[in-house]
């Protein structure tokens, strides 16, 4: 998971409580690049 996206974009879940790091990372990538 990219810390840059985590720091730049708001996360729906606190770090460590994410249901799936892969899903959250995909969402951040979509929002950041889209």
UniProtKB/Swiss-Prot annotation:
Cyclopeptide (His-Pro), cross-linked positions: 11-19
Keyword terms: Toxin
Post-translational modification: Processed by the macrocyclase-peptidase enzyme POPB to yield a toxic cyclic nonapeptide. POPB first removes 10 residues from the N-terminus. Conformational trapping of the remaining peptide forces the enzyme to release this intermediate rather than proceed to macrocyclization. The enzyme rebinds the remaining peptide in a different conformation and catalyzes macrocyclization of the N-terminal 9 residues.
One function term, GO molecular function aspect: toxin activity
Residues making up the propeptide: 1-10, 20-34
UniProt xrefs under NCBIfam families: amanitin
Function of the molecule: Probable toxin that belongs to the MSDIN-like toxin family responsible for a large number of food poisoning cases and deaths.
Family affiliation: Belongs to the MSDIN fungal toxin family.
Protein name (Swiss-Prot/TrEMBL): MSDIN-like toxin proprotein 12
Species assigned in the record: Amanita bisporigera
Gene: MSD12
